[in-house]
Amino acid sequence: MILRSEHIREPDGDSGAAMNQGDETDRRQHTRNMRVMRVARLAAPDIHAEGLGMVRDVSPGGMMIDAHFDLELGQTVSIALLDDQELTGTVVWKDGSMIGVSFAEEVPVDQILAKPSAQPDGKRARLPRFAVQRPVQLKLETAVVDAILHDVSQRGAKLQCEGKLRVHNNVLLRAEGQRAVAATIKWRAGDMLGVEFHRLLPVSELDQWLKL
C-alpha cells in the first residue's frame, strides 16, 4: 500500500524496540516507492466510468494518483499506463483529488514504468487512449470537414469522417474553445481514421479535450 509522507516518522531515541522496528518497516516501504509523473487511464468497472489520472508515486504494493474524476474508498479501479497494460487495485485512502490504490499482489515496478516498446506483432505500444464522443473539425489546406472524435491520447486520436481524406495528409484538429492540434493521418478504414499529433499534448490540454 502507498504510504503518504505524513505517515513516515523519524525514529525517536526514547522509543521502545517495537516502535523502532515499526519505523524501520515504514522506511523500507518508503524507499521502495518511486516518484513519477505519468498519465494513466482510470476506470471504475462498477459504474462503467473512466477518466484521466496522474500517477505520482509507485511501489510494488500500490500507487498514489491525482484522479481527475471522483472515486470512493473501497472502490475497485483499473489503471492503464499503456493502452494494453492494466493494473487493478482498491482505493484505500483519499485526500481531495489524491487517492491511494493498493494492489492485491505486488507488481514489478521497473516493468510497468518501462518506456513503450514494440509488441511481438511489431506494433508500437501506445499511451492510454480515452473514449470520447465529440464533434470536431479537420482543417486541410483547401477545406474544412466535420468529424466525430472517438478517442484521444497524448499522441493521437481516432475519428469518424466522411470527407475525402488520405493517409499522410496533414490536418488541423479543431474544437470550439480548444487549442488546435496539427496532426498527420496515419491510417484509414472506411469512414474511420487515425491521426498522430505533431506534439505531445500536455496533461492539462488532454484534460480539456476530455471535458469538451
Feature roles, as predicted:
Residues M1-L212:
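Structured alpha-helical
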